[in-house]
Amino acid sequence: MFTSSSPEQRKPRQSRQLPGAACEECRRKKLRCDRQQPQCGGSSLERRLEQQMQTALLPGDDILNMLDEPAFTVFPSSEDQLGLPAFNITNSTRGEQCQDEQFLDHFADMKGSEFTGTLTTTSIPELMRADLTLRADYRRGNGRDQLYFDRVHIFTPIIHQRRYLSWSKDAHKNEARVCLQYAMWALAASFSAPFQHLRDALYRDARRMLDLLELSDGAMATHHLEQAQAWILVAIYEFMRMNYQVGWMSAGRSFRLVQLMRLYGIDGANSPTQELPQTSSMEWIETEEKRRTFWMAYSLDRFISMRDGWPLTLNEQVVTTCLPAPEAAFQSGKPASGGFLSETITQEDTGALFSFTECIIIATVCGRSLSHGQKLEVERVYGDVSPDFWQRHQWLDAIVKKRIEILSLRCASATEVVDPLLLFTYMMAQTTVLYLCKLVKSVTWETDKSNPIVQEYEQRSLAAAQEIVNLTHTLKQFNFLKVHPFMPLPLYLCAEFLSMYRSLDASFDAQLQEVQNALRNLQAVNNLARTYLNLLQVKEREGSLRSSSEEIDL
């Protein structure tokens, strides 16, 4: 049985082999040529795309100027925008057919091709639409690549710019690198006002390609670093623009890839880097990218587990990978060592560390604090609190104090706007004080409410909460598109603490309002802020209902 079709669909399909010789441009690009004179449809199509991109997109200087506008200039995407309608390419039915065939042939003929044996013919045109637009855009000068390194790299410094640019234009790059490119472009677009209308389409293509890559033949035989990097970037995008659960699952995929590639043991005694010394700058850069990818996944694992106290995936106890080298050394390709985490975290005088390294140290403290609290819960199940609790607690407390002193000096001494990664790290350090205070109160509540340790922690928690509130004013210096993507996390944890312990200080109500206002300001560009605001409202209602119930019982 055949379904009815339009007159155009009932026409017999033309032979794929057309008479005449293909034009030089199509032969060079390995595309199917329609042999039209004086110019084939493929070449004219690309020229029209470039012209429309030049009209639709602003020059580089204008884009950079627009990026500094306030966040409220961001326009939300709509369903009709997700199909990229800004690039309205009109053509005859014959021209569209030629266009589709050219790119179908292009994907089918590529050696080491993008998605060889994995893409179906129905999914190729969807990817082709975005690919057409982006190819024309990037031919204008790496605008979105540069946007990634200007806006996103400061939060996720895992990609070497020169190395990336060396393979980014290669038509025969492997599938993992194509996935990474689309993930980079999607995240970069989400941090840019002019490119907001592109972000969802880029994300959908990146996510679809990553899913297909995992299902391809030989997917389990080899894993590329770029695949893990792409999942990290996609997870960050999903936390910001989708929802927490979707981002959580994607983050888990990146953690498993990091484990499969053994990135936690890059500098161990029996690792390849120790057995085969690196002789070239590029070899060191590739290894440093692996280190940074591991530490990014490691930090992400700890930060996203803080909200609900979830168990960690990446075990600190088996890590033998050095900390990241300084950024200048990384980008210049000059080998340098970042040292091991256990040594750096206990050193008395470390000087001014790389911002990413400071973030990793605080992520480690967050992870150890989580494990500290989880051990406490287990100890309660089996009996009394172990004496080891206080030893662990004092050790963590000493590290937090030290890092807060260092970070406060660095933030206070900044002559210009504070580094957003450093600001986020400092706020997470203050949040850890609040978390440790909650643990102390939960333990001493069962013994002595007037314990001096409790009183000391109450005072320190008051100071930490006040400092976080003060830092929310610093956020006003930033375009909201330049704020760290996980900034809503310390704001939420602080607001939760202020709401839970309002009785500690009369100023907590006013401070709570300031923190909630900061979350409201961020929710336009970050769904995490909206999620946390909703959670606070739910907890507020539950607290009100509980208070009403207690009054009735009395």
UniProtKB/Swiss-Prot annotation:
Kindly state which keywords UniProt assigns to this record, in alphabetical order. Answer: DNA-binding, Metal-binding, Nucleus, Pigment, Transcription, Transcription regulation, Zinc
Record feature DNA-binding region, as residue ranges: 23-40
Question: Where found, per UniProt?
Answer: Nucleus
SUPFAM superfamilies with a match to the protein in the record: Zn2/Cys6 DNA-binding domain
What superkingdom heads the lineage?
Eukaryota
- Tell me the GO molecular function terms: DNA binding; DNA-binding transcription factor activity, RNA polymerase II-specific; pigment binding; zinc ion binding
For biotechnology, the entry says the protein is used as follows: As colorants, MonAzPs are widely used in various food products for centuries. Moreover, MonAzPs also possess wide-ranging biological activities such as antibacterial activity, preventing hypertension, lowering cholesterol levels, causing hypolipidemic effects, and displaying antiobesity and antitumor activities.
Q: Which Pfam families does the UniProt entry name for this protein?
A: Fungal_trans, Zn_clus
Location (main, coarse): nucleus
Tell me, what does this protein do in biology?
A: Transcription factor; part of the gene cluster that mediates the biosynthesis of azaphilone pigments (MonAzPs), a complex mixture of compounds with a common azaphilone skeleton very widely used as food colorants. Positively regulates the expression of the azaphilone pigments (MonAzPs) gene cluster.
Q: What results from gene inactivation?
A: Impairs the production of azaphilone pigments (MonAzPs). Almost completely abolishes the expression of the azaphilone pigments (MonAzPs) gene cluster gens pigA, pigH, pigM, pigN, pigO and pigP. Decreases the expression of pigD, pigE, pigF and pigG. Does not affect the expression of pigC, pigJ, pigK and pigL.
Q: What protein name is recorded for this chain?
A: Pigment biosynthesis transcriptional activator pigB
Which InterPro entries does the protein's record reference? TF_fung (IPR050815), Transcription_factor_dom_fun (IPR007219), Zn2-C6_fun-type_DNA-bd_sf (IPR036864), Zn2Cys6_DnaBD (IPR001138)
**Upper classification of the organism:** Eukaryota, Fungi, Dikarya, Ascomycota, Pezizomycotina
- The gene is pigB
Region called Disordered, residue ranges = 1-21
Membrane-spanning parts = none
Q: List the disulfide bonds.
A: none
Query: What is a single cellular component term in the Gene Ontology annotation?
Result: nucleus
